[in-house]
UniProtKB/Swiss-Prot annotation:
InterPro entries: BRCT_dom, BRCT_dom_sf, DisA/LigA_HHH, DNA_ligase, DNA_ligase_AS, DNA_ligase_CS, DNAligase_adenylation, DNAligase_N. CDD domains: BRCT_DNA_ligase_like, LIGANc. Its cofactor is Mg(2+); Mn(2+). It is an enzyme of class 6 (ligase). This is DNA ligase. GO terms for biological process: DNA repair; DNA replication. Belongs to the NAD-dependent DNA ligase family. LigA subfamily. DNA ligase that catalyzes the formation of phosphodiester linkages between 5'-phosphoryl and 3'-hydroxyl groups in double-stranded DNA using NAD as a coenzyme and as the energy source for the reaction. It is essential for DNA replication and repair of damaged DNA. It catalyses: NAD(+) + (deoxyribonucleotide)n-3'-hydroxyl + 5'-phospho-(deoxyribonucleotide)m = (deoxyribonucleotide)n+m + AMP + beta-nicotinamide D-nucleotide. Keywords: DNA damage, DNA repair, DNA replication, Ligase, Magnesium, Manganese, Metal-binding, NAD, Zinc. The active site is at 113 (n6-amp-lysine intermediate). NAD(+) binds at residues 31-35, 80-81, 111, 134, 171, 287, 311.
Length: 665
């Protein structure tokens, strides 16, 4: 029996996955699994409408507002579509519309469902004026400047039927070939690879430097009109040709359909084209064709009644397991990995699949030599679904987890209450040390740009780094010994290491890898302690008083800092210039920046735009996007824009980077 507490827990779970998908762009479940959670939620809400609140995921469009961008209201709400995965559900949708419209024969416009980032574009008198992300459906991020960097976006339209005001819906995406080229470059630079083109497009659109956006070679395609944007267009099927007539890039591969068989035929045609299209799609969209009927049906919750998305199921394929290897994580957990005969699936070649743990291997009875079915859905790593027992080799043997760590030879242990098998040699196990360093430089912790996994491994193998603090003692001479590292790459890495020293206290706490500490708990500890030195002095009694911190966490924190090795590492990090700062503590009092308004323009040599803005805010200043008479200083780097001209016209003081750094200190 479902309780209200179960319902609330499900709401939190869905919002967690929303955040991973829309904001962090790192989903851990497939689209199909996510939609199953939503369907379960909706079933509960039908049975218990009294439990529904405005915070239910069923009542709101997935939020993805981002700090660093101005948010603006949508003139017409930007809704999301309801999803389906079966022919039967499409038939139910058609019958429902026939009943609502009051017609036996209903016309549909069917088109591709792009797997990109939904946006709105506004044109006035044919001139591109504004680009906005979906955001929460009511408000979105103003990405106008970044959208201007998209090469195939026309900044001016023309044509006989061009209205004075045009609000249109579209999708920004990264073409597959561009994605492959840029990922290859990231690989050479030792950076973390993008999981897929959608993640790449999402991250690129939110860059604060428009020049970097241009380098990502994004593209845009348009598929819809906002309500009342063009009175001359009466039906959805007319939209693509209308867009092309005024110079807009429009969706290809669309169909006019009148029944389920025509829709299904189109779906099958598109499914067969999916892997050869130059961009990613994840299904088709079925829309009621007549705009009058669309308007009459309106919306329900967060979705239009007159449209639905049919999403292609995760693709599956059969291949053979040629070996089962073991991967050691930073906490010593041993994870079995299936090494596969390479097979092309969902647009990429699959050669490995995680088997999660020994229990999973035993439950599915997965063995070396087995023919298995693998699945790859959306962004999720490939997984082994089942074994073809009829194809099993005669003398195959059940697989067993090794008794000794493959990296260091230490006997592994099973901790009571845990499925995981661990290597206890955390200080000397090479693989654990490397994984800890990779985590330390990653986004959840110190977020050191240009220092990817391959670079960490090279630095470790050459003996240049062993502890995290060694990273901040690296020299240009050491980095120059890395493979394919030339002057610019060396400078980029040295600058990134320097910039990472200014880190929030909660991320610094995360970087220390204290047991049981996630980002939420790290934020609570940072807010209470204010400095890392204070946190190191707190006892269990002090820590338990913090709301949200239990005895288990308090004990783990105290035990961590009681270890002389851990304390020594923190002190060395601080000595090397790492400066963890709490958002809740005023580090700088009576600073020259206090209450002053800054505008940043051009490229700085030692700071990104974001890190320079953080320095200003930490010292009590404010950062504005535009120059006005209220602006106190303009900080100008290389190749400044029109903001510098305006500052000079208004007589506002202009600081070069050297002067800015001097004022900071």
């Amino acid at each position: 029996m479902i309780t209200q507490k179960d319902y609330e827990k499900l709401c939190h779970e869905i919002w967690h996955h929303n955040k991973l998908y829309y904001i962090e762009h790192q989903p851990i479940i497939s689209d199909e699994e996510f939609d199953a959670l939503l369907k379960k939620l909706e079933e509960i809400e039908r049975s218990h409408p009294e439990w529904i609140t405005e915070f239910s995921p069923s009542q709101r469009v997935n939020e993805s507002l981002t700090s660093g961008f101005k948010t603006v209201a949508h003139r017409t709400p930007m809704l999301s579509l309801a999803n389906t995965y079966s022919k039967e559900e499409i038939e139910d949708f058609i019958k429902r519309l026939q009943k609502l419209v009051g017609k036996r024969q209903v016309e549909f416009s069917v088109e591709l469902k792009m797997d990109g980032i939904a946006i709105t574009a506004i044109y006035e008198q044919g001139i591109f004026k504004r680009g906005i992300t979906r955001g929460n459906g009511k408000r979105g991020d103003d990405i106008t400047t970044n959208m201007r960097m998209i090469e195939n976006l026309p900044l001016q339209l023309s044509g006989e039927n061009l209205p004075d005001f045009l609000e249109i819906r579209g999708e920004v995406f990264m073409p597959r070939q561009v994605f492959l080229q840029l990922n290859e470059q990231k690989l050479q630079d030792g950076e973390v690879l993008w999981a897929n083109p959608r993640n790449a497009a999402a991250g690129s659109l939110k860059l604060l430097d428009p020049k970097m956006v241009a380098e990502r070679r994004l593209a845009v395609v348009f598929y819809g009109l906002a309500e009342d944007s063009s009175a001359s267009i009466k039906k959805q099927a007319e939209v693509p040709s209308f867009f092309r007539s005024i110079g807009l890039p429009a969706l290809e591969h669309h169909a006019y359909c009148q029944n389920i068989e025509q829709i299904w035929k189109f779906a099958e045609e598109i499914r067969s084209l999916r892997t050869i299209l130059p961009y990613d799609i994840d299904g088709i969209v079925i829309k009621l064709n007549d705009f009058k009927d669309q308007k009459r049906l309106g919306v329900t919750g967060k979705s239009p009644r007159w449209a639905i998305a049919y999403k292609f199921a995760a693709e599956q394929a059969k291949t053979r397991i040629i070996d089962i290897t073991v991967q050691i994580g930073r906490t010593g957990v041993l994870t079995p990995v299936a090494e596969l005969e390479p097979i092309f699936l969902s647009g990429s070649t699959i050669a490995r699949a995680s088997l999660y743990n020994q229990e999973e291997v035993q439950r599915k009875d997965i063995r070396i030599g087995d023919l298995v079915t693998i699945e790859k859905g959306g962004d999720v790593i490939p997984k082994v679904l089942n074994v073809e027992l009829s194809q099993r080799p005669l003398h195959s043997q059940p697989w067993q987890m090794p008794l000794y760590c493959p990296s260091c030879g230490t006997q592994v242990i099973n901790i009571i209450g845990e499925v995981a098998v661990r290597c206890p040699n955390e200080d000397s196990c090479t693989e654990q040390q490397i994984r800890k360093l990779i985590y330390f430089v990653g986004k959840q912790a110190m977020d050191i740009k240009h220092m990817g996994e391959k670079i960490v491994i090279q630095l470790f193998q050459k003996g240049f780094i062993h502890l995290p603090s060694d990273i901040f003692a690296l020299t240009e001479g050491q980095i120059s010994q890395l493979t394919n590292f030339k002057t610019k790459a060396i400078q980029n890495l040295m600058r990134s290491i320097e910039e990472s020293k200014h880190v929030s206290l909660e991320r610094f706490i995360m970087a220390l890898e204290i047991k049981y500490i996630g980002i939420g708990t790290a934020e609570l500890l940072a807010a209470r302690a204010g400095t890392i030195e204070t946190l190191m002095q707190l006892n269990e009694e002090d820590l338990i008083k913090i709301e949200g911190v239990g005895g288990k966490v308090a004990q783990a924190v105290v035990e961590h800092f009681q270890n002389p090795k851990h304390r020594q590492e923190v002190y060395r990090l601080l000595e090397l210039g790492v400066c963890p700062q709490s958002k809740t503590v005023q580090i700088f009092t009576n600073h020259a920046f206090q209450g002053k308004i800054f505008v940043l323009t051009g490229s700085l040599e030692h700071y990104t735009r974001q890190s320079a803005a953080s320095l200003i805010k930490e010292r009590g200043g404010k950062v504005s996007d535009s120059v006005s008479r209220k602006t106190n200083y303009v900080v100008a780097g290389a190749e400044p824009g029109s903001k510098l001209d305006k500052a000079r016209t208004l007589g506002i003081p202009v600081l070069n980077e050297k002067e800015f750094i001097s004022l900071c200190h």
